[in-house]
From Swiss-Prot:
<dbReference type="InterPro" id="IPR009010">
    <property type="entry name" value="Asp_de-COase-like_dom_sf"/>
</dbReference>
<feature type="binding site">
    <location>
        <begin position="212"/>
        <end position="219"/>
    </location>
    <ligand>
        <name>Mo-bis(molybdopterin guanine dinucleotide)</name>
    </ligand>
</feature>
<dbReference type="GO" id="GO:0006777">
    <property type="term" value="P:Mo-molybdopterin cofactor biosynthetic process"/>
</dbReference>
<feature type="binding site">
    <location>
        <position position="83"/>
    </location>
    <ligand>
        <name>Mo-bis(molybdopterin guanine dinucleotide)</name>
    </ligand>
</feature>
<keyword id="KW-0732">Signal</keyword>
<dbReference type="InterPro" id="IPR050123">
    <property type="entry name" value="Prok_molybdopt-oxidoreductase"/>
</dbReference>
<dbReference type="GO" id="GO:0009055">
    <property type="term" value="F:electron transfer activity"/>
</dbReference>
<feature type="binding site">
    <location>
        <position position="372"/>
    </location>
    <ligand>
        <name>Mo-bis(molybdopterin guanine dinucleotide)</name>
    </ligand>
</feature>
<feature type="binding site">
    <location>
        <begin position="508"/>
        <end position="509"/>
    </location>
    <ligand>
        <name>Mo-bis(molybdopterin guanine dinucleotide)</name>
    </ligand>
</feature>
<feature type="binding site">
    <location>
        <position position="482"/>
    </location>
    <ligand>
        <name>Mo-bis(molybdopterin guanine dinucleotide)</name>
    </ligand>
</feature>
<dbReference type="GO" id="GO:0042128">
    <property type="term" value="P:nitrate assimilation"/>
</dbReference>
<comment type="subunit">
    <text>Component of the periplasmic nitrate reductase NapAB complex composed of NapA and NapB.</text>
</comment>
<dbReference type="GO" id="GO:0045333">
    <property type="term" value="P:cellular respiration"/>
</dbReference>
<feature type="domain" description="4Fe-4S Mo/W bis-MGD-type">
    <location>
        <begin position="39"/>
        <end position="95"/>
    </location>
</feature>
<dbReference type="InterPro" id="IPR010051">
    <property type="entry name" value="Periplasm_NO3_reductase_lsu"/>
</dbReference>
<feature type="binding site">
    <location>
        <position position="150"/>
    </location>
    <ligand>
        <name>Mo-bis(molybdopterin guanine dinucleotide)</name>
    </ligand>
</feature>
<dbReference type="InterPro" id="IPR006657">
    <property type="entry name" value="MoPterin_dinucl-bd_dom"/>
</dbReference>
């Protein structure tokens, strides 16, 4: 599309706004103005975090050459963060993979062989043999897949169908297990439905923002720019930031709180106690819309059953709860006094009181934001439940400017991992594999025999590592993720299984990541606008984009790989006779015919695409594959509070927030006048629960799985930095971003460094009970840990910080705690 005068003016306004917000607009975006006639522009959501910013992608001669913030995108309003402006360069790293690579020796596959180029047919030949052998000898539980919150919606849906229906294996899990699983379980326990009830529009209407374990200044910078604008434009607006170390978000904080790791649970219960003691409960809301329950305690740490902590737990993995009275709940939180909380957390009393007053003040509209500080936590589900308690006690929920809001880290952790249901226990639209009715709904819609989908929950991310190591999981396909770098406890629990001769590991990726180089077969993958896609962001906004360029060489999309590989299997090879007898018409058919080339999926002709519109998969297959998969998937949520709009609407819009009913999106769920599922006169209805009421849980403080001691005397917290995203497999290939932050460092308090005879710039060995890495001492800069804690980002493949981390998880969500383990330092 051409740049109109209006668009040109908007682009200049964007540049001015970006400068005012401290956001960089690099030359690649500025230089496009003089080239408009030669560049074709189209919309897309950003490839990086879960904010879901809209961008305009400029293509020229088959390449992405420019990118700018989309002034018509309601999320970012024309702004991009530094990563977003460099999107054109993420696809053009010098080491981009362009053909399949198999470990070979003497002309055939060998686990210890060298990576050798092969054809796609050869790659699928080897995969077919490995899958069929495992299925025949050990059954569906011997194969698995690790997917991604970066999959497009239809890629995740196709993968889930292939494994849960085709291969009859629930051993499929996304990397969102490592970042959003605690949020999912927290939502389900409290509300009976997943995902936030509010939206980003809350920012411009809130009186107070409370960040719990969220460095939004670096991890969600566009949303942070909106919060900054709200705070600096209104003197009565307050910002509170809670963390175990000081970071850039503290620069805006009116109340910056540093607490002892794990003690956020104490603070949350203290605030609930403060609300009750100060008669700040919204009695009308509370009496009509809330139930009280006491949760099981001493639930363990998600470690192997043989671990001493698991043996000592009284209720390992228990999600049980029982009703309780208000008086009992009042007595429960009464134990969390101001004095006790200050002592356990290390937070001054006046700061705790100021924080509690924000929630207790009936005239303050409060938003609570959190990300990995809450979720990557051995009691992450509890932390989610406890922050909901504060909003339910005060009625500050499901209304403009008020509410709890779990922010996501990946572009489609919501839209794909959660909504599609690519977790080992989930199906589309909040359905689960353990529910016979839910399985039946899916089997009927997919026209497969009753009983095809297993009722047993599959292996979650950490359990997959353990099963590979134990030789129980033998064929493993990972897509769109770099778990050898990103997952916990690399040395003890992941690398042994990947390099075990009993196992065959496939990695689909655009680049030779740490994971790819540890695999047996690497499949080159198309990325971002090299394929047609859809993401769902943190505010329930589903966004589409068109394919705008073609992938290099033989690189193919994850969707193409899944669909084409399904052709290699006939139903007789994957389903037992008792299933085939129920639908004999499926005998002799391939999984491609049963799952993808069905009348339901293939009914949309390629002619619906514009004549010059790229869509490699659909043009090869002869039908509009993405539309067919999306419309089939969307059926599950329509009429059930997860309504998605018709496929074509999304290509016209800058995203729509579900539920979309009668063409209208929903900004605030569960409240009358905002949510189409709440009838007139109901006020609020949390319709995920049978009685329409949300749940307040009584849950105590319980300690971390590992804490500093005399030998390992420091806490280690891991995370990200502004310039890089996750493991850096894309951002480190952008020269400007790499130069801005070329290698990971160890952020440490100056006094802790001095006590160990360390100075800024020194090399230091960081050692845990599981491994060691060499890093660089940093006593200044953006992150300032308190004494007793160090912080390391995980983007650097040369410093695999996850050699150090413990594979302890929240026992309910199975999400790893990357924020708390014990280390010691040795000068190099």
């Amino acid at each position: 599309m051409k740049l109109s005068r209006r668009s040109f003016m908007k682009a200049n306004a964007v540049a001015a706004a970006a400068a005012a917000a401290g956001l960089s607009v690099p030359g690649v975006a500025r230089a496009v103005v003089g080239q408009q006639e030669a560049i074709k522009w189209d919309k897309a959501p950003c490839r990086f975090c879960g904010t879901g910013c809209g961008v305009l992608v400029g293509t020229q001669q088959g390449r992405v050459v420019a990118c700018q913030g989309d002034p018509d995108a309601p999320v970012n309003r024309g702004l991009n963060c530094i990563k977003g402006y460099f999107l054109p360069k993420i696809m053009y790293g010098k080491d981009r993979l362009t053909q399949p690579l198999l470990r070979m020796k003497n002309g055939k596959y060998d686990k210890e062989g060298e990576f050798t180029p092969i054809t796609w047919d050869q790659a699928f030949d080897v995969m077919e043999e490995k899958f069929k052998t495992a299925l025949k000898e050990k059954g569906p539980e011997s194969i698995g897949m690790f997917g991604s919150g970066q999959w497009t919606i239809w890629e995740g849906y196709a993968a889930s169908k292939l494994f849960k229906a085709g291969f009859r294996s629930n051993n499929i899990d996304p990397n969102a297990r490592h970042c959003m699983a605690s949020a999912v379980v927290g939502f389900m326990r409290t509300f009976g439905m997943d995902e936030p009830m509010g939206c980003y529009d809350d920012i411009e209407q809130a009186d107070a923002f409370v960040l719990w374990g969220a460095n939004m200044a670096e991890m969600h910078p566009i949303l942070w720019s909106r919060i900054t604008n709200r705070r600096l434009s209104n003197q009565d607006v307050t910002v509170a930031v809670l963390s175990t170390y000081q970071h850039r978000s503290f620069e805006l904080a009116d109340n910056g709180i540093i607490f002892t790791p794990q003690s956020d649970l104490v603070i949350l219960n203290y605030i609930a106690n403060y609300i009750i003691q100060n008669n700040a409960i919204n009695q009308d809301f509370f009496s009509k819309h809330v139930n009280l329950r006491k949760g099981a305690t001493d639930i363990g740490y998600g470690l192997r059953p043989t671990h001493p902590l698991e043996k000592a737990a009284k209720n390992p993995g228990s999600d049980a709860s029982e009703p309780m009275s208000f008086e009992d709940y009042k007595a429960f939180v009464a134990e969390y006094t101001l004095e006790k909380t200050a002592e356990m957390t290390g937070v001054p009393k006046d700061q705790l009181e100021q924080l509690a007053q924000l929630y207790a003040d009936p005239n303050k509209k409060v938003i609570s934001y959190w990300t990995m500080g809450f979720n990557q936590h051995t009691r992450g589900v509890w932390a989610n439940n406890l922050v909901y308690n504060l909003h339910l006690l005060t009625g500050k929920i499901s209304q403009p400017g008020c509410g709890p809001f779990s922010l996501t880290g990946q572009p489609s952790a919501c839209g794909t991992a959660r909504e599609v249901g690519t977790f080992a226990h989930r199906l589309p639209a909040d359905m689960v594999v353990t529910n016979e009715k839910h399985r039946d709904i899916c089997e009927k819609k997919w026209n497969i025999p009753s009983g095809t989908i297993p009722a047993k929950i599959g292996l979650h991310a950490v359990a997959q590592d353990r099963a590979l190591k134990d030789g129980k999981l033998n064929v493993y396909w990972t897509m769109c993720t770099n778990n050898m770098q990103a997952g916990p406890n690399i040395n003890e629990e992941r690398m042994p299984g990947w390099r075990d001769p009993r196992n065959f590991i496939i990695v689909s990726d655009p680049y030779p990541t740490v994971s790819a180089l540890a695999a047996d077969l690497i499949l080159p993958t198309a990325m971002w606008v090299e394929k047609e896609g859809a993401y769902g962001n943190a505010e329930r906004r589903t966004q589409f984009w068109r394919q705008q360029v073609q992938a290099p060489g033989e690189a193919k999309s994850d969707l193409w790989q899944l669909v084409q590989f399904s052709r290699r299997f006939k139903t007789e090879e994957v389903w037992p006779e008792e299933l085939l007898a129920k639908k004999p018409e499926l005998r002799g058919k391939t999984l491609y015919e049963v799952l993808y080339a069905t009348p339901e999926v293939s009914k949309f002709p390629v002619s619906e695409l514009a004549e010059d519109q790229l869509n490699d998969e659909s043009r090869e297959l002869g039908f509009y594959l993405q539309k067919g998969l999306f419309e089939e998937y969307a059926w599950f949520g329509r009429g059930h509070g997860h309504d998605l709009a018709p496929f074509d609407d999304y290509h016209k819009a800058r995203g729509l927030r579900w539920p979309v009913v009668n063409g209208k999106e929903t900004q605030w769920r569960y409240s009358e006048g905002n949510d189409p599922y709440v009838k007139a006169g109901e006020g609020y209805k949390f319709y995920g629960k049978p009685d329409g009421k949300a749940v307040i849980f009584a849950l105590p403080f319980e300690p971390a799985a590992e804490a500093p001691d005399e030998e390992y005397d420091l806490w280690l917290s891991t995370g990200r930095v502004l310039e890089h995203w996750h493991t850096g497999s894309m951002t480190r290939r952008v020269p400007e971003l790499h130069r801005a932050f070329p290698e990971a460092v160890l952020f440490i308090h100056p006094l802790d460094a001095k006590a160990r005879d360390l100075r800024r710039g020194d090399k230091v060995k960081v050692v845990s009970r599981r491994g060691e890495v060499i890093s660089i001492v940093e006593t200044r800069g953006r992150n300032r840990p308190p004494q007793g804690l160090v912080y390391m980002p995980f983007f650097d493949a040369a410093q695999l910080v996850n050699k150090l981390t413990l594979d302890a998880t929240d026992p309910l969500s199975k999400e790893t705690d990357f924020k708390k383990c014990a280390v010691k330092l040795e000068k190099v």
